[in-house]
């Protein structure tokens, strides 16, 4: 879940509230091809490169906890455990808003290298 943990998050978010998307109550403000920002889904089958790709770091508005680029910019590897299949979360520019929902996960084979999966260097907030 995307839970706001800042003591004074400002007017867009409420401390302690769980949000369905990393951008808040809606996917508005994320970087994805079709239904982010409330645009109707479209067919991209005629576009060979599937869109413009990931947005530059920090170019989307900050979301829950003031973090940038958490919504649909690139899938993030979230599982480094044993086994061939590894978990990803957060969606990417290649997919629509439904893939960035807090309950959505995908798996990819270990060693997958594609333009819509990345990683995030992170530190515990405590």
Describe each PLM feature range.
Residues 1-106, 115:
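Functional-site microenvironments in short loops/helix caps that host divalent-cation chemistry
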Residues 116-126:
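Short, structured beta-strand segments at or near domain termini in extracellular proteins/domains
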């Amino acid at each position: 879940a995307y839970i706001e943990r800042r003591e004074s998050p400002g007017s867009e978010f409420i401390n302690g509230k769980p949000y369905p998307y990393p951008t808040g109550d809606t996917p508005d403000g994320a970087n994805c091809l079709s239904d982010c920002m409330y645009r109707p889904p479209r067919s991209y089958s005629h576009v060979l490169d599937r869109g413009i790709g990931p947005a530059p770091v920090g170019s989307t508005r900050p979301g829950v906890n003031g973090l940038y680029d958490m919504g649909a910019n690139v899938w993030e590897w979230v599982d480094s455990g044993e086994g061939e299949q590894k978990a990803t979360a957060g969606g990417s520019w290649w997919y629509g808003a439904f893939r960035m929902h807090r309950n959505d996960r995908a798996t990819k084979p270990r060693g997958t290298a594609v333009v819509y999966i990345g990683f995030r260097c992170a530190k515990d907030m405590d």
